[in-house]
Amino acid sequence: MIQPNDYSHFDIPTIYVGYDPREDLAYRVLKHSAHKHASGPLNVFPIRQDNIRRIGLYRRAWELGSSNLPKPENDADIQHRDQFDGRPFSTDFSFTRFLVPFLHRLEGWALFMDCDMFFRSDPLELFRKYNDDKYAMYCVKHNYHPTETIKMYGNEQYDYSRKNWSSVMLFNCGHHGHKNYTVDDVSTKPGRWLHNLLWLEDADIGRLPEEWNWLDGHSPADLDAKNVHFTRGGPWFRHLSWSPVSDQDEMYAQEWENLATEIKQQ
């Protein structure tokens, strides 16, 4: 087990962030917050779909349209649908997140995060505290069922079991639970198989405290978030598709906006 401040037989702790060019600022805020709070060296890399397609790690097919929603205002808002299972998805990283064990060479620990988040605490705490080798991964095991029918970019909201478990995943990349899991699975398995983590036994999935994936509009307001997740959209969608539903949501939104201002002033 890793001891505090001991990474002698591991790479520098690494975070892979789901990247969508429409949310570049969100990615940059997350990266900025990670480095701002980190107590030591840390890598933060975006998972860019165009790059991983180019090197042959990803070939999942998708199509535009087929939505029963009103016509969107621009092409960027047209519903994306997966050609394998016909289900809607909303971002470039809906499935590419599941490549993290392979991107990390099937060894050591690596963290995946959606881009619509920001740290309020030291991200290295995750690597120091949650590294029991009996687990193939850790996540916050949310019981989350959104009430909205439409999400960002006018896409349909789709509910499924274990929703938001896959938005923060700390992978033990060399764990035996991944031995039958392949790069090809990421391009060919149904989205529900991937997001429900069905290549793993339930006992292989460790639990992170909810403050590491605090969901706006859902998580307890009195829980002091270490990582805030704007799963309903975020302050960069103010006056479009997102608004706070609690004082805590607004407080965290203002913190995010302050980080965005810091980036713009650099």
Give names to the regions the model predicted.
Residues 61-97, 102-104:
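Short, structured active-site "lid" loops
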Residues 32, 36, 128:
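Short, well-ordered alpha-helices that flank and scaffold nucleotide-derived cofactor binding pockets
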Residues 95-145, 170:
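GT-A fold catalytic core of metal-dependent nucleotide-sugar glycosyltransferases
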Residues 10-11, 36-41, 103-111:
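Short, solvent-exposed loop/edge-beta patches enriched in aromatic
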Residues 1-22, 28-29, 39-40, 46, ...:
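A glycosyltransferase accessory/donor-loop signature
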Residues 23-24, 119:
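Alpha-helix N-cap/loop-to-helix initiation residues
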Residues 128-194:
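Conserved catalytic core of nucleotide-sugar-dependent glycosyltransferases
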Residues 86-88, 98-99, 124-127, 151-158:
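Short secondary-structure capping micro-motifs at structural edges
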